[in-house]
Amino acid sequence: MKSYEVNFDGLVGPTHNYGGLSYGNVASQSNSQQSSNPKEAALQGLAKMKALMEMGFQQGVLAPQERPDVAALRRLGFSGTDAQVIERAAKEAMPLLVASCSASSMWVANAATVSPSADTADGRVHFTAANLNCKYHRSIEHPTTSRVLGAMFANQQHFAHHAALPAVAQFGDEGAANHTRFCREYGDAGVEFFVFGRSAFDTRYPAPQKYPARQTLEASQAVARLHGLRDDGVVYAQQNPAVIDQGVFHNDVIAVGNGEVLFYHEDAFLDTDQMLAELQAKLAKVGGKFQSVCVPRSAVTVDDAVRSYLFNSQLLSRPDGSMLLIVPEECRGNERVWNYLQGLTSSGGLIREVKVFDLKQSMQNGGGPACLRLRVALNETELAAVNPGVIMTAPLYGSLTAWVEKHYRDRLTESDLADPQLLLECRTALDELTQILKLGAVYPFQIN
């Protein structure tokens, strides 16, 4: 049976703004309080989805969340009508209103960790929503994330959904941004690669000094247990704490994997040789030939990697067995990075082509091509069981672009977030979106 890797891209929400909420994310902090363009952001994301679909890749879409999150503000003590809650929050605690308006759910690499059926004990595709407890504005996402994923992957014969891990620092979980999977073919048993920043309970592991390590070893281990993964099918690796302190807040800012290939920076991990040997040995047990492509610091510095998002790219398999790298425009703007990529694609290796996309609106908030997508490996039967409304087609692209043009503002500043009309605009838009994507009632305003 044929199998596919389907990229489900996050649709940018109508409240996309530069709130500077993500400590440790250099782009997010450096662009704080600039005016944003939600319409342009959503259209840029949709253009990437359409392009990949037209290249023959399986492409889906993941709906944004309801923002402002009035229920979250009510839990923090603001009361009255919805409009009064927003007005009070703007007057008394603007940072909380900004957090409740964040469109950060567009970076669906953080939505969940996904294990395909070939890896799991019960032969189903498993999803665990990420608790994202390191940042308040993201910690409020997982209930809606779980409902949306449940509406997309509803068939319990094929799909299993787990609630987010306990929302405490010891089980900080950032989802697929710290997880990748190596395999020969997408339908074959593979090796799941979990990258953590620190251990919550074992003091032998070092930790960063400046920025927080958002993923714990214990969270990764818990997800592997929930998904019923074999010990032989899992590798845990620690991200280098020094690069976390340089702005590498998720592993997908310093490494990307696909198929049998890991593309990574020389400084990405601790105990790299041991990690590579374990990946090679475990992948060999399931018939795979592990390959690594190391980018030396002499060619591309960590700072170059963070500024260009070279590794926050999509590494995609083509029918001829070669690979394509999807990178943001910022890579072309960095001379060292661009020179490295030209050399890489002409060297005769597996990565033979680079395609560049303009994702500036997302990039300025610290999210590149890899942040915007959640990878789900599915066989033909499982793909047929996915809600067809979320699979990208030319008609769906047309419907979604028209929907964005109709509902989204082309400029949003911090002061605009206090406008109660914005809440009404967003709810009207999302109500229509659930009909377009055939999701049913997934948002709090539709349920309560």
Curated annotation (Swiss-Prot):
Residues annotated as catalytic: E174, H250, C371 (nucleophile)
EC number: 3.5.3.23
Record field: transmembrane: none
InterPro entries: AstB_sf, SuccinylArg_d-Hdrlase_AstB
UniProt binding sites for substrate: 19-28, 110, 137-138, 214, 252, 365
GO MF annotation terms: N-succinylarginine dihydrolase activity
Catalysed reactions listed for this entry: N(2)-succinyl-L-arginine + 2 H2O + 2 H(+) = N(2)-succinyl-L-ornithine + 2 NH4(+) + CO2
PANTHER family: N-SUCCINYLARGININE DIHYDROLASE
Entry's family note: Belongs to the succinylarginine dihydrolase family.
Protein name per UniProt: N-succinylarginine dihydrolase
Organism: Pseudomonas fluorescens (strain Pf0-1)
Underlying gene: astB
